[in-house]
Swiss-Prot record:
Biological process terms in GO annotation: RNA catabolic process
The keyword Nuclease is assigned to this record: yes
Family: Belongs to the RNase T2 family.
Native organism: Aspergillus phoenicis
Full protein name: Ribonuclease M
Amino acid sequence: TIDTCSSDSPLSCQTDNEASCCFNSPGGSLLQTQFWDYDPSDGPSDSWTIHGLWPDNCDGSYQEYCDDSREYSNITSILEAQDRTELLSYMKEYWPDYEGADEDESFWEHEWNKHGTCINTIDPSCYTDYYAQEEVGDFFQQVVDLFKTLDSYTALSDAGITPSEDATYKLSDIEDALAAIHDGYPPYVGCEDGALSQLYYYFNVKGSAIGGTYVASERLEDSNCKGSGIKYPPKSSS
């Protein structure tokens, strides 16, 4: 099991502590990233879907593919071996690959190999009685748990921003609606072809990335959307 950290562990990116199992560094800015996949449509029609959990450096740069020895090509079987069947079925629904279900596994592999291996607080050395790939299951569970606290679809809907073939929206209204579920901090809002496509919610973390305290923080990248006329196309029901 992962070692426990004290509740008064320092907050990442807010002090220059040495990296440790209880201090995320250099990747101290943790981003929970989401997709709105409408072309082709993916995931439930009334929910955004998971992209990942990324450890960005505190200046917005990032490392990637940090540990060749822990790159895996069998995420599904790792989770099954850990009896994480409920997690796996949730991921199939809310963490799908836009190219289709047969690509889900490669998408999950990509997210772990590129980003998960760079989270220093889930290194095997941070575990007691570690067993191989234990941190992989913990990573995917943590991403899902964090995603469940960030219901972007409902936050937008509560502000009157709903998928539509013809309505368009203002960036400031979108940001305000999403800031309401993120302690007043708007996420990065990403557009493609003038339509909503991605969200990045930024956090600093007290303690480990697994089970630590995620504290909403300012985004390190400005939206690439225009100020108004933003489309939010419905997902097709097929």
